[in-house]
Structures are given as structure tokens and as C-alpha cells.
Regions:
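Glycine-rich phosphate-binding loop signature in dinucleotide/nucleotide-binding domains
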Residues: 78-81
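N-terminal phosphate-binding loop and adjacent alpha-helix
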Residues: 47-76
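Generic alpha-helix structural propensity
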Residues: 26, 62, 66-70, 90, ...
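Oxyanion-binding/catalytic loops of NTP- or PPi-dependent enzymes
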Residues: 39, 46, 55-56, 140
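Short, flexible, glycine/charge-rich loop motifs used to bind or transfer phosphoryl groups or to couple energy/partner
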Residues: 9-10, 75-76, 138-139
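Switch/connector loops and helix/strand junctions flanking conserved nucleotide-binding motifs
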Residues: 41, 57-59, 94-98
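Gly/Thr-rich phosphate-binding beta-strand-loop-beta motif of the actin/hexokinase/Hsp70
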Residues: 3-50, 83-90, 168
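Active-site neighborhood for divalent-cation/phosphate handling
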Residues: 84, 88-173
């Protein structure tokens, strides 16, 4: 199990030193610490720790404590300096849709519009969804329009991964 001193050490790491990427599969937890130097990303450390069988089944976390323990071991193996972690959501758990929007909208206006229109793109209730979007760099024939990538997943997919990250003494970002 987790050593209490290791958890305390992770809690007091410098919060913005870098970012830890976390990938949870059915067989392992992988971590990769990135930092920014001279405008470029650098891999500072990485590790892979196997998971006990049955901890993650069909991409669903069934045993958060076991996965959190494996993540904590991976963090210790990688000797990361950050306490902030971002995680991947399996593509099978995400819904993506490219939508065309006015180019002159602010980010806040775009978010309001996406939330108003999201029900037509997402096959589950919005109060059960986590949404994100990104303006794509590709140019459309109409310079007044942009393509926006909308990504949605069920909140439970986010919450289960946040729980694992917090169990390992990290802060989800």
C-alpha cells in the first residue's frame, strides 16, 4: 500500500513545475512528466506499473484503490516533480463532433452557444456530461467561420479518473 510519507511528499511538490500525463488501461498505469523549456515540451520522466487483474474492465475503473496505488507507485518510480496530473479518456468513452461556428465569437460566447446546442450532438443528458471544445486551426472557405471540435464524455468517466489521481496524492488538472 501507499507509504504515508510518499503521499505527503507528493502533496508538497511544486505545483507548476510540470504536468504529469496519466494513461490507465486494463493492464497498466502509465505516467509521463512533461515540462516546458525554451518553448518546447520535454519528457522529464516516465514509468509503467502493471495493474492487478480486474481493476479496470472494459475501460471502466472497478477498483479505484488498486489503480490509485499503482499510480502512486508509477509516480514514485518516475520520481516526478509535479503534483498536477492530466489524464486520457479512452476514445470509446468520448463523443466528438466538428461543428462550424462564427469566427468572431469570444471563447465565452462560443461556450454558451455550444452548451445551448449540445443536446443535438450528445446522446445523454447534459447534466451527466463533461464538455470541452477547441477551435481547429484548419481554414474554411468562408473566413468568417471556423471549425470547432466538441468533445463530450459522461461525468462518471471523469470522476472515476479524478478519484484515482487524488488517491495517488495528485491534483487533477
Amino acid at each position: 500500500k501507499n507509504n504515508r510519507n510518499d503521499i505527503v511528499r507528493r502533496l508538497y511538490r511544486k505545483p507548476n513545475k510540470g504536468l504529469i500525463g496519466v494513461d490507465i488501461s486494463s493492464t497498466s498505469v502509465k505516467v509521463l512528466e512533461l515540462s516546458m523549456k525554451s518553448g518546447r515540451y520535454w519528457v522529464e520522466s516516465y514509468a509503467l506499473v502493471p495493474l492487478p487483474e480486474g481493476s479496470v474492465v472494459e475501460k471502466n475503473i472497478l477498483n479505484p484503490e488498486a489503480v490509485g496505488d499503482a499510480l502512486a507507485r508509477a509516480i514514485n518510480l518516475a520520481n516526478t516533480q509535479s503534483n498536477q496530473a492530466a489524464f486520457a479518456i479512452p476514445t470509446s468513452m468520448a463523443i466528438t463532433k466538428t461543428i462550424e461556428m462564427d469566427a468572431d465569437m469570444t471563447s465565452d460566447e462560443r461556450e454558451v452557444q455550444i452548451r445551448e446546442d449540445a443536446e443535438q450532438y450528445i446522446p445523454f443528458p447534459l447534466d451527466e456530461a463533461s464538455l470541452d471544445f477547441e477551435v481547429l486551426p484548419d481554414r474554411l472557405t468562408n473566413p468568417n467561420r471556423v471549425n470547432v471540435l466538441l468533445v463530450a464524455t459522461r461525468l462518471e468517466n471523469i470522476e472515476s479518473r479524478c478519484e484515482v489521481i487524488e488517491l495517488a496524492g495528485l491534483t487533477p488538472k
